[in-house]
Amino acid sequence: MSEHEDSLLFRQRHTLAHVLAEAVQRVQQRDVEVAIGPAIDNWLYYDFLFSPEKQIWEEDLKKVQDQMEKIVKEWQDLIRIDVPAEESDYLVNTLMKQKYKDEMRREFLAAWENISFYINTIVEAAKDRVLQWIDENYVKYYEWITEYLQTKYPEKFAGKFVTFLDMCEWPHVGSTKEIDPKSFKIDKLAWAYWRWNSNNVMMTRIYVWAFSNKEELKEYSDMMEEAKKRDHRKLGKDLDLFFFDDLTWKWLPMYMPRGYIVYHLLEEYIREKETKLWYLHVMTPCLWNVELYRTSGHLAHYQDGMFPIMEREWEEFVLRPMNCPHHMMIYANQLHSYKDLPIRIGEIAHDFRFESSGTLKWIERSRHFCQNDAHLFVTPENMKDEFKKVVDLIFDVYKDFGIENYRCILSLRDPEDKVKYHQDDEMREKAENALREVMNEIWIEYTEEIWEAAFYWPKLDVNVKPAIGNEYTLSTCQLDFCLPAKFDLKYTDKDGEKKTPIVIHRAILWAIGRFFAYIIEETKWVFPVWLTPEQVRIIPVADAFNDYANKVCEELRTNNFRVSVDEWWDSFNKKIRNAELLKIPYILIVGEKEVGSNSVSVREFVSKEQYVLSLDEFVKKLDEIVKSKK
């Protein structure tokens, strides 16, 4: 048991999962299948299967919340019993009548001799008062269970009345009096497949926030309210950036014109950065013969994350999940000398991964994405220098976007896992040691974590902690001694001998959509001017000044700025409001005074400053701001 799992807060949350299940049983007169209920991060949840007539919906959650608080205030004691296989069978199948618990019980018995149960109890003398509003059949059911347990375990259950019984191994608090009844709150109702398998039944999942006290709950609740304001899904819809539709498959994003402007600018930005570092950009197909992935090892180690194989004209094809094998083919298409290396092959590549729906999060993680990918073919002599340049590029990009809240992780394989990873211990150890040595030489603070490596190479992951949600990887850089050998890649060294290059895999923005989502949520869509889809909105104070407004617009467009004129019939104030809702950096107001002086009245969205500039002065000012990437 880890220190986290033995902490008071973990035990409180885990007990609240049982309290949640008990509350649902009370609300639905026990007509429910209970499945599993763990504590996770700031949450806990429990999965249920309801009969159609007893299904719980959002409007029922208030009743469940009230029952949870009532149960906690009952100061229920939790009693643990450990029973052998035969008795566990009786408890689960005869008393509880829970088939999903029985499925887990059978699995547990393969590893353990005894099965643990936690039983919620109240003082028996208080039963009639505490349960006076509870369904009579529910009470009779637990009278039957109480009688059995009092007979079987008199020393534990004398004077106790059972209110809930669950099979469980993890630790709990001794009594619900150790839980603040105002320290938790039901958050939402969701859906999840039993055992995370889409071939199984779909269950109802209820999520609950839980903390040590009501103050911590309020702090977290306030943070989540802020998160809703920043959520890229909401902002994407409100600002006409992108959307998802069931007709096109809800995990494939559709970018609107405003959203695609930003998407394209991000592509241009990173491509320009790479070109200055002598990257050679290529384009490779999205659909490949499946033999390519057999050669690379992806089919053996990553097929669950790939789209199904297609067969046409006696050949098998698959949508590519990643670009490594394709860039190996690009390299192999020509002969190379050591003088040619390093060769830096880059691509903004369309990739397709059939990841489970539970891991997907709109454009942050979708089944189709464009990866800012590159593969550097290097010699042992220039490997370290090239790796350092990649790290420098990562932090140069982060500086441009003001990204400061990140951590570096050296991700290594689990040596005990013989399934996930390519089995070449010598090559793997060589790559891990080389990567560790480089990290130490460039003085980057990092932590080492096992299990997170790719199946045939170790990697440096740069994880960001966004303003909302959990941290995730935004950039990655991987060292590979394996794939070049699989594709028999060679270069001629200075002695005329054939050698195998080392490959550095790297993705700076990872996927363009993920990076887009990150900066939306970090900035609340207050983007730097160079990245904003509409940089200037011109608003004439009356129709008489539309011609001048369009003249200003033409001048700005000639200088490659993104600008529009609002000539709609809305009121002047509504036009201002509309521009502010879209968070357009500059609103230019033009009227009689501006026409006479060839000037514009400027309103800045961020600073709220208002001032007047000549048109030439404003063009010069805006040009400097855009070029500075501010």
What name fits each language-model region?
Residues M1-E33, D41-W43, D47-K630:
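NTP/phosphate- and nucleic-acid-binding module
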